[in-house]
Design a protein with these regions (language model features):
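Pocket-flanking alpha-helical
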Residues: 1-28, 36-39, 123-124, 140-149
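Alpha-to-beta junction loops
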Residues: 5-14, 84-87, 104, 123, ...
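A conserved helix-loop-strand patch within extracytoplasmic ligand-binding domains
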Residues: 35-89, 189-193
Length: 226
């Protein structure tokens, strides 16, 4: 953020929730209803505009093994709370230390797990498949959540902020090059969380080249020519 304000570059991708909390120093949870206010504050304070909102929300969530979700009919965090005492919860160490981490989430949803364990972030998924844990933290665009053995639950009380991705652009650039508005508008709702997770899976799991994955996707959407 400081670099674009200085004029080091003219646009960059950013997340709404990050900007709301870190840049604007707002304490209330960011929701999509606050987007117009976020954009207004960016224009007023920094002469920056939000354009080209990609359409995906890269926020925190909880995931459960699919067999358990089906057996207990668990679709939301609140559903999970009813049966949490039967389950082992796993998360990376810093999740238990953060202000918006385990304690705050457990208090908000009245979650009381049979056991909570901290583990390396890279080991969580395998631990879930191996039934060493039953529930874990995820990001909503993680490549591995497209695995059918996992169900991502709905944060039905809106505990976590929305981290919608979009472009932050200098207003003076938009004024000098109004045609940029049309280009950036083509990025609106380009992909949802499922699509982003699918693309991440190609890179994280299939080890495909990120540039090639992005290029192919943009060509399929008609935004790039061969």
């Amino acid at each position: 953020h400081p670099a674009i304000v200085r004029g080091d570059f003219d646009m960059y991708p950013e997340y709404t929730g990050t900007s709301w909390q870190i840049v604007l120093k707002k304490t209330e949870t960011y929701t999509n209803e606050k987007f117009n206010l976020l954009d207004q504050e960016y224009r007023r304070q920094y002469k920056l505009a939000w354009k080209g909102m990609f359409g995906f929300n890269d926020t925190y969530s909880l995931a459960i093994r699919a067999d358990l979700a089906k057996r207990y009919n668990i679709k939301t965090f609140s559903d999970l709370a009813k049966y949490a005492g039967d389950f082992v919860f796993g998360a990376e160490y810093d999740f238990f230390e953060r202000e918006d981490g385990y304690k705050a989430l457990a208090d908000s949803y009245k979650l009381q797990f049979k056991k909570a364990v901290d583990m390396d972030n890279g080991l969580k998924y395998q631990a879930l498949y191996d039934k060493k844990i039953d529930v874990m933290t995820v990001f909503t665009t993680d490549g591995q959540i497209s695995d059918p053995r996992i169900i991502v639950l709905e944060d039905d009380l809106g505990f976590y902020p929305k981290y919608m991705a979009g472009m932050v652009v200098r207003e003076d650039i938009l004024n000098r090059h109004p045609e940029l508005n049309l280009v950036l508008d083509k990025l609106n709702n380009l992909m949802d969380e499922k699509t982003m997770s699918f693309l991440n899976n190609k890179v994280e799991i299939n080890k495909e080249n990120p540039r090639d994955v992005a290029k192919k996707f943009l060509m399929e959407k008609g935004l790039l020519e061969e």
